[in-house]
């Protein structure tokens, strides 16, 4: 990867390590993610992440792909896989909530501004046939002007590439939809909008809504907050692998979500409760949420015009030790 001058490490996770680097050809500062090898993050995962990023190119609230590169190691030993993306100089939304605001709730108008950006990006992502499958404040970067960028597509999936069953579990536990916790492998992009509902609640409360310690604890927290009657009436509920254990665990109170957000406007609560509908078929899509009165009748104008994602065919660069090719 001689084309890129490494400037320092900015993050590391189960899938790989991310460095900030300078593109020697263009002078641009970029983020370079090197996927770990040998722990389930090989060439298939690299290609899937790059294809998802490529499908979502051109939207202001989705991190932009610059290049994807597979470099064969000298002397054999397999390949190193890299994804090169735009670099956003700013903290994660999680850090803003936790450190800069120190757990203080966002005012409703500011929460609406941020949620509009996230919903706009996710609506475009879903229109491009991509599920993110790990939406959380850690995977949202806040730019210098307060604009949000959704990043880390390492768990993403192009839905057009194949029908269910999909991998389970996916999504970080605190933001995981109930159907996923109950073992569903026939989920769809609505798992992302549940995660957005969790993020919206976190903005309004200043802390995670469902900070579960285990899958069962997480499920209990969800059903104790939003109730279980809605989920039990879903035709697909009985087919879920863990449905019986959820029913037998204990009695569930009715939803108390409204009690937890008494100052939220009726229009805002319609969005929050719609995103946090336990029944997937009653959950708001991102596009539907943007059509709710909370956004359409807001005093302040939209901060971003919806942009259609690109749909150009992705062709990865596969080479020996040559530079990455921008796609």
Curated annotation (Swiss-Prot):
Entry-linked SMART domains: S_TKc (SM00220)
Catalytic activity: L-seryl-[protein] + ATP = O-phospho-L-seryl-[protein] + ADP + H(+); L-threonyl-[protein] + ATP = O-phospho-L-threonyl-[protein] + ADP + H(+); [DNA-directed RNA polymerase] + ATP = phospho-[DNA-directed RNA polymerase] + ADP + H(+)
Gene Ontology molecular function: ATP binding; cyclin-dependent protein serine/threonine kinase activity; protein serine kinase activity; protein serine/threonine kinase activity; RNA polymerase II CTD heptapeptide repeat kinase activity
Entry EC number(s): 2.7.11.22, 2.7.11.23
Domain Protein kinase: 4-295
Active-site residues, Swiss-Prot/TrEMBL: 134
List of residues binding ATP: 10-18, 33
Membrane-spanning ranges: none
Sites of Phosphothreonine modification: 167
One GO cellular component term noted in the UniProt record for this chain: nucleus
Record protein name field: Putative cyclin-dependent kinase F-2
Species the sequence originates in: Oryza sativa subsp. japonica
Lineage of the species this protein comes from: Eukaryota, Viridiplantae, Streptophyta, Embryophyta, Tracheophyta
